[in-house]
Amino acid sequence: MTSTGRFTLPSEENFAEKTKELAELWGADAIRNSDGTHLDEAVLALGKKIYSAYFPTRAHNEWITLHMDETPQVYLLTARILAESNAVDVPLMDGFFEEQLKPNRDADPHKYWEVVDRTTGEVVDPSGWTLDPGEDTVHVTAAVPLHEYTVSFLAYIIWDPVEMYNHLTNDWGDKEHEIPFDIYHPATRKFVFDTFDQWLKDSPQVDVV
């Protein structure tokens, strides 16, 4: 006995004929778009249910590039740096991907960041270090020779991690990096709801989001 249904087939642009063939072969009752792609009109016309991925907090660079202080943030920890004198420089971005992360230079670093003497475990008083925002380096001026130091600092996420993975894995070349945004911020939250509402109106062919 042959039955159909309960199977969703992923598809993407320029894949209409093979999608039709596989849908018939495997008895698919629904088709969804692959991440970062759109379905061809020929696929939409197959008469299957359409599942569509919608990303409420990315893929709108026209908005977030005007509000770059409203991207998500993370705390990062630098590598340990050995002080060879009473001053030591700790580079913030060594080991981090600069296309994905950017130090938050907007908020007061002495309020939100932390420099730690890893040899003693003590937090260095904020008066004992300064940030060079041009070099993304913390200058520790109250160091103890032969002690190791780290910096915990806030950074903006400027490339959505999932989209970055797909971009690099699929070799999307010069496709614009999608910048994520944080709906904690009222203006961005309103933008997210407004654009989703408009997307629903513009996507009557979609059965399941």
For each of these PLM feature ranges, what is it?
Residues 1-5:
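Transmembrane beta-strand segments of Gram-negative outer membrane beta-barrel proteins
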